């Protein structure tokens, strides 16, 4: 049985981990053992926060819609209910974008929602 030396594969493995840990603070970016632990932990954070990002953006959209709705004398929930009753299907992302970039369009939607609520 011939002896297997792992110089090439080890070098490649270390290089891969240290490349992933580039820019990390202190030994986390330069020492292989510590860098490997940090790369694994970074992957866990990235996985969790890819899911959290969706919640945070939805929350941000709702806050923006609520702020804009209150300028027109409606609460967020009454605006959404009015839009639903008026048969207007606009998702929260688009509605928040309208509230920020096109206040006139948002005002028109708010009026339609208020009209649907009063009927």
Swiss-Prot record:
Gene3D superfamilies: 6.10.160.10, Ribosomal protein L20. Keywords: Ribonucleoprotein, Ribosomal protein, RNA-binding, rRNA-binding. One of its GO terms (molecular function) is structural constituent of ribosome. It holds the Pfam family Ribosomal_L20. GO terms for cellular component: ribonucleoprotein complex; ribosome. It comes from the Bacteria. InterPro entries: Ribosomal_bL20, RIBOSOMAL_L20_CS, Ribosomal_protein_bL20_C. The keyword Ribonucleoprotein applies. Coiled coil: none annotated. GO terms for biological process: ribosomal large subunit assembly; translation. Belongs to the bacterial ribosomal protein bL20 family. Binds directly to 23S ribosomal RNA and is necessary for the in vitro assembly process of the 50S ribosomal subunit. It is not involved in the protein synthesizing functions of that subunit. HAMAP family: Ribosomal_bL20. This is Large ribosomal subunit protein bL20.
């Amino acid at each position: 049985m011939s002896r297997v030396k792992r110089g090439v594969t080890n070098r490649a493995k270390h290089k891969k981990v240290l490349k992933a840990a580039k820019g990390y603070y202190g030994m986390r970016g330069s020492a292989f053992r510590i860098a490997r632990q940090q790369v694994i932990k970074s992957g866990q954070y990235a996985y969790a926060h890819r899911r959290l990002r969706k919640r945070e953006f939805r929350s941000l959209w709702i806050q923006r819609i609520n702020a804009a709705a209150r300028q027109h004398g409606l609460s967020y929930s009454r605006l959404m209910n009015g839009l639903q009753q008026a048969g207007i299907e606009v998702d929260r992302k688009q509605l928040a974008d309208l509230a920020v970039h096109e206040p006139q369009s948002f005002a028109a939607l708010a009026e339609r929602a208020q009209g649907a609520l009063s009927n």
